[in-house]
């Protein structure tokens, strides 16, 4: 008998950890709902010959995009092989689903919100549990962790990735709308108390297949995240099941962090590091030589609005320091000096990593920072990770994942890295670094903007520009951080969070809603693109709009929030009909053809 023991399941591993390959055992073998449970009773003898170990996987290994639809009397599971594009449609057939699972259980199952919903419903259904009952309980429960324990669905291993974990705040239907693909919602009532008709089953299959195709498109947009997680798993000998973890939990695991109670020094005063020099009285008083207060949410916070004698205002808060000349335009060369990975390097250089990381693993974060910088400037196209060759850029992006996730995870209450004081001190120290930097520039330049990790300014003269660079470079060396210098030739600025800046080589930097979330949020895109092209290229916005023949550029994507019960559309004559939660809307010139969308709450 060949039995697979899942080492990542502590309960199983404790029973098998002292058993050697080749041992002859007396076992207790039970079958439940088509699955075997093997419990070792005692060892009969040690084996002389090591059993045959297959050189190839005994099951199929591929990437499967999938989605499920669960009704009271029907269940639908649809899978699509990413490489062969083959569909697998399993409708009301538990035995067929079990065969499929056993054949593909070593494959990667990729869905949208599958970590909390689809995976657990499918696992429970494979074990013979009521799929509808599990579905309703997961959807309606306020304590999903308790639900998962109650159904014990993790007994059936499932490997994969949840695209919802990096969804940029959008639902799958919204992503589908942005991509210009079908967003039609199902017309079949999930709570009907009867089996589906053949026609309803066909509609349900079509709806589900469409969601799988949308998941595939989103996967292709986000494949870098899978590669990043796989890189980290390879570097730290992690199990492939860890790919399903959130970035924050994955980071906590590789750093060996375990949850601790909040320490009693939470509000203790901040002692200014000897490498920093703060002369601005108001800022020094806000951060130094007193205990900190907790805000109404029980979190540490400093709130300060500081305006200097030149009228330049900077706002200090839990999100960093921000300042900008409002409604400002500048045509002409100017520098933006920004810190390389300010928070990650501040944590390392100022000893502000989470105190939940054990001493024997605390070096890992600094090692990753160094590895990333070495790889970035190595000039090598390929990196070797434990005998596996990967493109260097893939390794760099993989290392960025824990480096950039660590700060946020330190403030996540249920994460192993949770250390609210040190998270606050990272932010506060970063703001003091920015203040020290501001003081070195002040008097020698006019400030354009200040954000979390950068100051943009116009030097008063070439001599002042040189003096600023010398002072800033000396300061950067003193605190052990890297300070970059990017040049720009023009900027159009609404505020610090909304601006368009152009570099000498013509590369455009867009910040804020006008940038359509990095080009992902294709809603009212024609307005944003016409505006950017008018400013940057001098293109007449009317010509730009009239020359555009891509319908998707004109779409307006709307979504009814969860606080509303339903969406209705009202035509020009006042007639109302139900609309979808997510809708694709277009402007029309003829008002008689127009409809109005309304979100309703039942009172």
Region annotations inferred by a language model:
Residues 7, 39-47, 52-58, 69, ...:
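Conserved "right-hand" nucleotidyltransferase catalytic core of DNA-directed polymerases
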Residues 11-16, 22, 27, 31-61:
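N-terminal accessory regions of nucleic-acid-interacting proteins
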Residues 29, 68, 113-114, 163, ...:
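Residues immediately flanking
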Residues 57-80, 343:
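Gly/Thr-rich phosphate-binding beta-strand-loop-beta motif of the actin/hexokinase/Hsp70
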Residues 74-78, 119-126, 345-348, 458-461, ...:
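A short acidic (Asp/Glu
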Residues 79, 83-174, 207:
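Conserved DEDDh/DEDDy metal-dependent 3′-5′ exonuclease domain
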Residues 167-172, 180-182, 187-199, 310-436, ...:
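Helical catalytic core of nucleic-acid polymerases
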Residues 396, 431, 435, 465-601:
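C-terminal, non-catalytic extensions of nucleic-acid polymerases
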């Amino acid at each position: 008998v060949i039995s697979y023991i899942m080492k990542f399941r502590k309960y199983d591993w404790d029973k098998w950890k002292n058993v050697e390959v080749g041992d002859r055992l007396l076992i207790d073998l039970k079958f439940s709902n088509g699955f075997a449970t093997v419990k070792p009773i005692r060892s009969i003898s040690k084996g002389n010959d090591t059993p045959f170990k297959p050189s190839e996987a005994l099951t199929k290994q591929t990437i499967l995009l999938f989605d499920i639809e669960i009704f009271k009397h029907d269940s639908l599971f649809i899978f699509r092989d990413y490489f062969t594009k083959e569909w697998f449609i399993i409708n009301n057939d538990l035995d067929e689903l079990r065969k499929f699972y056993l054949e593909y259980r070593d494959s990667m199952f990729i869905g949208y919100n599958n970590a909390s919903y689809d995976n657990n419903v499918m696992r429970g259904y494979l074990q013979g549990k009521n799929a509808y009952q599990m579905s309703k309980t997961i959807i309606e429960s306020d304590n999903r962790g308790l639900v998962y324990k109650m159904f014990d669905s993790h007994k059936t291993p499932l490997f994969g990735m949840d695209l919802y974990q990096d969804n940029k705040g959008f639902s799958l239907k919204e992503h589908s709308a942005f991509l210009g693909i079908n967003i039609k919602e199902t017309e079949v009532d999930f709570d009907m108390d009867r089996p589906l008709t053949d026609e309803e089953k066909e509609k349900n299959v079509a709806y589900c297949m469409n969601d799988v195709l949308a998941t595939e498109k989103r996967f292709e947009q986000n494949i870098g995240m899978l590669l990043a997680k796989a890189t980290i798993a390879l570097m730290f000998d992690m199990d492939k099941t860890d790919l399903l973890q959130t970035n924050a939990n994955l980071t906590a695991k590789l750093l060996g962090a375990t949850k601790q109670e909040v320490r009693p020094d939470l509000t203790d005063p901040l002692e200014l590091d000897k490498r920093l020099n703060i002369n601005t009285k108001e800022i020094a008083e806000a951060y130094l030589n007193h205990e900190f207060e907790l805000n109404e949410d029980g979190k540490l916070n400093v709130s300060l609005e500081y305006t200097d004698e030149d009228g330049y205002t900077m706002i200090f808060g839990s999100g960093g320091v921000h300042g900008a000349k409002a409604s400002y335009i500048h045509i002409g060369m100017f520098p933006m000096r920004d810190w390389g990975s300010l928070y990650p390097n501040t944590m390392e250089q100022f000893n502000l990593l989470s105190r939940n990381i054990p001493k024997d693993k605390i070096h890992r974060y600094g090692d990753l920072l160094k590895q990333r910088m070495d790889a970035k400037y190595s000039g090598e196209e390929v990196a070797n990770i434990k005998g596996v060759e990967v493109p260097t850029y893939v390794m760099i992006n993989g290392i960025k994942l824990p480096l950039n996730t660590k700060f946020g995870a330190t403030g996540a209450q249920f994460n192993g890295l949770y250390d609210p004081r040190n998270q606050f001190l990272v932010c506060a120290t970063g703001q003091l670094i920015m203040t020290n930097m501001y003081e070195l520039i002040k008097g020698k330049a006019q400030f354009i903007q200040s954000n979390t990790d950068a100051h943009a300014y116009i030097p008063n003269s070439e001599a002042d520009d040189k003096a600023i660079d010398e002072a800033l470079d000396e300061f950067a060396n003193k605190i052990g951080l890297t300070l970059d210098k990017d040049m720009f030739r023009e900027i159009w600025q609404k505020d610090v969070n909304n601006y368009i800046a152009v570099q000498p080589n013509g590369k455009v930097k867009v910040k804020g809603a006008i940038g359509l979330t990095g080009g992902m949020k294709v809603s009212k895109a024609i307005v944003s693109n016409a505006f950017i092209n008018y400013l940057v290229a001098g293109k007449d916005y009317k010509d730009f709009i009239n020359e555009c023949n891509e319908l998707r550029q004109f779409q307006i994507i709307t979504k009814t929030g969860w606080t509303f019960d339903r969406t209705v559309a009202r035509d020009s004559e006042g007639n109302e009909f139900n609309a979808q939660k997510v809708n694709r809307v277009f402007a029309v010139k003829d008002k008689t053809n127009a409809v109005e969308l309304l979100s309703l709450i039942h009172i």
